[in-house]
From Swiss-Prot:
Lineage, uppermost ranks: Bacteria, Bacillati, Bacillota, Clostridia, Eubacteriales
Organism name: Ruminiclostridium cellulolyticum (strain ATCC 35319 / DSM 5812 / JCM 6584 / H10) (Clostridium cellulolyticum)
UniProt keyword terms in alphabetical order: Ribonucleoprotein, Ribosomal protein, RNA-binding, rRNA-binding
Cellular component, GO, one term: cytosol
NCBIfam families: S20
Name of protein: Small ribosomal subunit protein bS20
Keyword Coiled coil: no
Biological function: Binds directly to 16S ribosomal RNA.
GO molecular function: small ribosomal subunit rRNA binding; structural constituent of ribosome
Domain of life where this protein originates: Bacteria
InterPro entries: Ribosomal_bS20, Ribosomal_bS20_sf
Amino acid sequence: MPNIKSAIKRVKVNEAKTLENTIRKSALKTTIKKCKEAIVTGENTSDAYTAATKALDKAAAKNILHKNTAARKKSRLAKALNAAK
């Protein structure tokens, strides 16, 4: 444990941010999974794809994912969506 007051605060802040990022990343994974399931079943594909791309863009904007990772995931979802049509 740190002894300096500012270091103690940094530990608390980092724990809080880690928890928040974990929650956001989990929600993102769920959204992507729902999009993939929608593509397989063929129901509400455009809505699911829109939600997934929006979530990926938000995650990239908040530095939860790297922007290139988000772009790659969006590209792969779009490719799967077009292949399913």
